[in-house]
Each structure stands twice: as structure tokens, then as C-alpha cells.
Design a protein with these regions (language model features):
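Beta-strand acidic-aromatic groove motif in beta-rich domains, primarily in extracellular
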Residues: 61-70, 153, 234-235, 560
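Bacterial Sec-dependent N-terminal signal peptides
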Residues: 4-8, 19-48, 140, 345, ...
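Sec-dependent signal peptide hydrophobic core
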Residues: 8-14
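Detector for C-terminal structural segments
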Residues: 555-576, 581-584
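C-terminal structural cap/anchor segments
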Residues: 451-565
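Short, hydrophobic/amphipathic alpha-helical patches that form generic packing surfaces
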Residues: 46-58, 343-354, 468, 544-555, ...
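Structured, solvent-exposed acidic/aromatic patches
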Residues: 77-473, 538-540
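Membrane-proximal, proline-rich intrinsically disordered regions
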Residues: 25-72, 356-357, 361, 582-643
Length: 643
């Protein structure tokens, strides 16, 4: 047994006391230091950029409000009410605005300043200059997102003080210059060779060539936004960006991997209670477009008996569906599948009741709503009596939103399971969210060519490359025959670039009379020019381009489809039904709906009350910059104005 002598005990005790004393001092310092706070030396710009890219994905709370309920509704990428009929929620707007300002724009502003400080004081790493440009580029995207929602944005905010605001004209001038300068610097700035740093860029891994391509494509997008209000500025910036080279391949696509759960990387369309139903706009664009038959696309035997002839419209129930809308398909129930449809449609929206399709979405998983396809129509003169039971399995329908008035009491058919809905692959958080696809670059170049600007491709080449890129992304077939098709969709547009013949005002089609059961001829009318915001033509090159851009950008880029319609009035958007007055849209009535106006469509979001009440000088500067009332139907700088 070992026994310490007194000397050893004394020495051990002194050492222990000294150790305890040192540890106590260290513990005291640690207790008085915030364990979650990082010093300026500990924070790296890539951490801040990573935070901003991730937060921009939008957690489910913000995504449901901004991406789904605002953008997809405003951009007509799904069937919805709310914003489409003038409604908005200050809570939704506040949640979105504060999140993007605090979690995206503030970190990016800090990252830019941090890199600048390091460059000036000589402590910068070799790749800090390129990281600074990445932060500038992503900051431009975030500024453009806010500006395109609210019509104004703060450029000098996000540093603690109450900001002032500028309008879209000033904001776009700033953003276009930022993109030009950042892209020019990235042409020569050394990229990161640090593997750990590169992992923090979920889009491009700090590949400077890819970020430069994105900057150039973003510059093309923003330049084109000014095409109707400042063509000179738009042309100059667009031509420079196009010459420098943008996103033109799948490998350059700006996309970020989603993941399941509840955080910023969770899928933006993942909430099961959001139905994501096919919109009449999308349906009218794809029906008849491209000349590819449903029989060619749907080869499984279960579809064969449901496919209808190409000239068949469906069953006419004009006493059960609203007619106070510019939707040319109003009043019909399609009792099967269309004879001809764009091949991307069945890849994006899954046929009602097609539960054998592995991409069928069973959401909400806690009910049978998605798989219930049988409902009743009531007697038009006695809503207590059943008129007909309809099973909508294997059908393709998209009924207009808005006010159905008394028709709600006699039509139970408008349900989750009776209409095509967005495919599961877009909803289950396993996909990559696309912020900029290669197809968009091509469609932008095609539009620039139509405008006579100097670009590296002809309009036809760019247009067809955009379509091919979209088909490849969707895994759709028959693209070669599609590109030569001269068949018109429901709004009078064909695919073939060289086919610009306008359709006749009417065409004779077949339908079944829902009340007599007899097959009849029906005079189908394409939407008249008075029912369109874009009045130049139904089948010119610009209409073709924006039609294809809309289809290709569905469902990932609803803010772009909304912005294109605000800018051009393209593609054709139907008006909501107005069987009874709309509370937030009194300008649209049953007697005026057929002659459309800019204010029949939402133009922006009112500013959050946190700005209205918490920053009055800032709010006053915002309204002055907006140049109009802080309301949903006030057009922003680059948009079409009410005539």
C-alpha cells in the first residue's frame, strides 16, 4: 500500500490549488462571455453567405406564405384565391419581409463589408475577393425579390438603423451595376481552393465561373424587366451580359438541394394542406399545344378508354359552372383526358385519381381527399335534389377561382381529388429548388432577339434551345415533332417559330350537352383582344416565347411568371369568376369582366405594418418612391399601367 509523506502531500495540495485557481479564472472568464456569440475574428464571410443562401430557401412557415400563397397565386401557377382576388395578409408579408431582411440581406451586407475590410488591411485570404463578389451577386437577387414583391426596397438598410427606401427604377439601376461589376471581377479573381469553405456554398461550391454565369443571367433577367419602360438601359445591360455568357447548361443551373424536416432547406411546396391544384392558365396554355397526343404519352392500358378526340371540349354544364370569366374553357367538365396536350403537363401535374402513378401526391396524408373523385351536381332549380353523380378519375379539369355565388350550392365537384395536382417530386423535399434554369437564359435571349438587340443566337435558335432544355429537365418526349407543330392551344398560340398565322376567331368543336346527353357542335371562341392585356397578337414570337417560359418555369419560378405578366400581360391570364361581387376587387364586375384592365390582376404586396408603424420616415420615403397608393393593384415602375 502506497502512503504519501507530508512533503508530497503539501506539494500535491499546492499544485491542486494552483490548478483550481487557474481553472476558476478561466471558468469565470467563460461565464462572462456569451457562449453563442462569435468574435469578429471568428466569423468568416462564407458563414454569412451560407446563412443567406439557406435562409432564402424559406422555411415552411415563410414558404407557404410567400412562395405558395403569394407568388404561385399571383403567377397563376396553381388554382388559388387570396391575392388573385385582391386579398393579402399583413402577417404573411411581415413574416416574409423580416426573415429575408434579417437572415439574408443583413448577413450579406456584413459579408461584403468584412471582405472589404480584410482586403484593405491586408488580412484577406486569396479568395476573399471572389467571396465578396458572390455576396454582392446573391444580395442583388434578394433585393430584386423584395423589390418585385413590394415595388420598393431599401438598399442602404440592414445595418441596424431604420432604412429609407427607393423605387424600382433606382433599385434596378443599382442592381444592374452591382451585377456588372461583380461579374467583371470574377473573371480574374482567384477562386477558393479550401474544401471546407467550398462546402458552404450549396449552389456552386464557390466555382467562380458558375457564379459569373449566374450574375450574367441575372443581369439579363433584370435588364429585360425594364424593356417596356427604359429600353435603352435594358438593351445596353442585356447585350453586355449576353456577350459575357450566362447559364446555358444543366450543370450551370442555380439550384439548391432540399431536405425533409422543418428548417430553411425543407421543400418550399411541402406543406400537405396546400393543395397545389392545376390552374386554368396553365391548362389553357398546354391543351392542344405541340400536337403530341395523349395516346403517345400515356401508353399504359389504364388510360386508353379515357382519352378523347382532339376536337372534343367535354360536357357542357353552363348552369353549374360560372361563365363570368374570360376563361375560354368556362362552363365545361372534361370527362376524360385531352386528345392533345403539351408533354410536360403530365410530368408536372398528375391526372386526377391516377393513384398508380408513382408521382401521384396523396397529400394530405391524414385524409382521403386526394383519392376521392366522386361527387354530385345538384339540380339547378332545386339544390336539395341530386342531379348527377360524377366520377372525375382519369380526367383533366381546371376550374376558375373567384366568386361562384349561388353555384357553390349546386356544384360539389370542385374538390382536391377531382383536379390534377402538382407531382410528388416537387413536394416531398427530395428535389433541388431551381432559382435559375438554363431554359430561362435561352428564352430571355429569344426575347432580346425579337426586340432587335444584339445577342449570340437567333431568336429561333434560342427559343428552340429553351424548349429542348425544358423538355430535358422534365424528362418529356417528342420534342422534335413538338417544335414543328402548328396546332393552337386554348388561347390561340402554336409552338412552331415560323408559324405566326393568327387563328380564326372561332373554331367548331364537339361537346356533350350535360342536360340532354346529346353530342353537339360548339363554337369555341379564342379570347378576344378586349379580354387580353397584350393586344398585339395571339401567335406572334413574343407570345410564343412567354408561353414557353411560363410552362418551363412552372413550378419553381412563380415570381417570374407573375413578373412577366405584370410587365407584358403575357401569357394570357383568365379573370376570376364574379358571380357575386368580390370584396377586395370591386373594379371587376359581372358586367365589366370581359374587357380587361391591369387592375384585374394583383400588382404587388402592401408594405408590412412593421414599416408603416415602426419607421414612419422610411414608410413615407417608400410611398413617395412607389409613386402610388400602398395597395395590391398599384403597378410598380416596370409593369404595365392602367390605360
Amino acid at each position: 500500500m502506497y502512503i504519501m509523506n507530508k512533503k508530497n502531500i503539501l506539494l500535491w495540495g499546492l499544485c491542486l490549488c494552483a490548478t483550481i485557481g487557474i481553472a476558476s479564472c478561466r471558468d469565470f472568464d467563460e461565464v462572462n462571455t456569451n457562449p453563442t456569440a462569435a468574435s469578429q475574428d471568428q466569423v468568416l464571410p462564407e458563414y454569412l453567405i451560407n446563412r443567406a443562401i439557406i435562409a432564402a430557401q424559406q422555411n415552411p412557415h415563410v414558404a407557404e406564405r410567400a412562395f405558395v400563397l403569394y407568388w404561385k397565386t399571383g403567377g397563376h401557377q396553381h388554382r388559388g384565391g387570396g391575392l388573385a382576388v385582391g386579398g393579402f395578409s399583413d402577417g404573411w408579408s411581415s413574416d416574409y419581409y423580416s426573415r429575408m431582411a434579417e437572415e439574408c440581406l443583413k448577413p450579406l451586407t456584413d459579408a461584403i463589408a468584412m471582405c472589404e475590410k480584410r482586403i484593405k488591411d491586408g488580412t484577406a485570404r486569396t479568395y476573399d475577393k471572389s467571396l465578396q463578389q458572390v455576396a454582392r451577386i446573391w444580395r442583388v437577387y434578394m433585393l430584386s425579390e423584395l423589390c418585385d414583391n413590394f415595388g420598393v426596397v431599401s438598399i442602404d438598410g440592414y445595418q441596424g438603423a431604420n432604412p429609407t427606401y427607393v423605387g424600382a427604377k433606382e433599385a434596378y439601376a443599382y442592381m444592374l451595376t452591382e451585377l456588372k461589376e461583380a461579374a467583371d471581377i470574377l473573371a480574374t479573381a482567384p477562386g477558393s481552393d479550401n474544401g471546407e469553405t467550398n462546402k458552404l456554398d450549396r449552389a456552386y461550391g464557390y466555382n467562380t465561373a458558375k457564379w459569373r454565369a449566374y450574375a450574367n443571367s441575372m443581369r439579363m433577367r433584370l435588364a429585360m424587366r425594364l424593356s417596356e419602360v427604359d429600353a435603352t438601359t435594358a438593351k445596353t445591360h442585356f447585350e453586355e451580359a449576353a456577350a459575357a455568357g450566362g447559364i446555358t447548361s444543366a450543370s450551370d443551373r442555380f439550384e439548391v438541394q432540399e431536405k425533409d424536416g422543418w428548417d430553411d432547406l425543407t421543400g418550399v411546396m411541402s406543406r400537405q394542406w396546400n393543395h397545389q391544384i392545376l390552374s386554368p392558365t396553365y391548362s389553357n396554355l398546354v391543351l392542344g399545344l405541340g400536337g403530341v397526343s395523349s395516346a403517345t404519352q400515356l401508353t399504359d392500358a389504364r388510360y386508353a378508354s379515357h382519352i378523347k378526340p382532339a376536337d372534343y371540349l367535354g360536357v357542357r354544364y353552363d348552369k353549374h359552372f360560372p361563365l363570368t370569366t374570360t376563361d375560354p374553357s368556362a362552363g365545361f367538365y372534361m370527362d376524360g383526358l385531352p386528345g392533345i396536350i403539351d408533354p410536360r403537363a403530365y410530368k408536372t401535374f398528375i391526372i386526377a385519381g391516377d393513384t398508380e402513378n408513382p408521382d401521384f401526391c396523396f397529400y394530405p396524408s391524414w385524409s382521403k381527399a386526394a383519392t376521392t373523385t366522386e361527387y354530385k351536381l345538384k339540380d339547378a332549380t332545386d339544390k336539395e335534389k341530386d342531379f348527377k353523380t360524377i366520377n372525375a378519375k382519369y380526367t383533366w379539369n381546371a376550374w376558375v377561382g373567384g366568386s361562384w355565388g349561388d353555384l357553390n350550392a349546386i356544384n360539389d365537384l370542385v374538390q382536391v381529388g377531382t383536379m390534377p395536382r402538382l407531382g410528388l417530386k416537387y413536394r416531398n423535399s427530395t428535389n433541388k429548388r431551381v432559382f435559375f434554369g438554363e431554359w430561362e437564359t435561352y428564352f430571355l435571349i429569344a426575347e432580346a432577339a425579337v426586340r432587335g438587340w444584339t445577342v449570340p443566337l437567333t431568336g429561333k435558335d434560342a427559343y428552340e434551345k429553351g424548349i429542348r432544355a425544358s423538355f430535358a429537365y422534365q424528362g418529356a418526349g417528342s420534342v422534335d415533332s413538338y417544335l414543328t407543330s402548328q396546332t393552337y392551344n386554348r388561347v390561340g398560340t402554336s409552338v412552331a417559330w415560323d408559324h405566326t398565322t393568327e387563328p380564326a376567331a372561332t373554331v367548331t368543336m364537339k361537346c356533350m350537352n350535360g342536360y340532354t346527353g346529346q353530342t353537339e357542335n360548339y363554337t369555341y371562341r379564342y379570347p378576344e383582344m378586349k379580354s387580353r392585356l397584350y393586344k398585339a397578337a395571339m401567335n406572334d414570337h413574343l407570345t410564343k416565347i412567354i408561353t414557353q417560359k411560363f410552362i418551363a418555369n412552372t413550378p419553381w419560378l412563380p415570381l417570374e411568371t407573375w413578373s412577366d405578366h405584370r410587365r407584358l400581360g403575357l401569357p394570357f391570364f383568365e379573370t376570376p369568376a364574379v358571380e357575386k361581387a368580390l370584396d377586395n376587387m370591386p373594379q371587376l364586375t359581372a358586367s365589366t369582366y370581359s374587357t380587361v384592365s391591369v387592375d384585374y390582376y394583383p400588382q404587388r404586396l402592401p408594405l408590412p405594418s412593421s414599416i408603416v408603424n415602426g419607421n414612419k420616415p422610411g414608410y413615407e420615403s417608400a410611398i413617395k418612391a412607389l409613386g402610388g397608393e400602398d395597395k395590391v393593384f398599384t403597378p410598380i415602375y416596370w409593369a404595365k399601367k392602367k390605360q
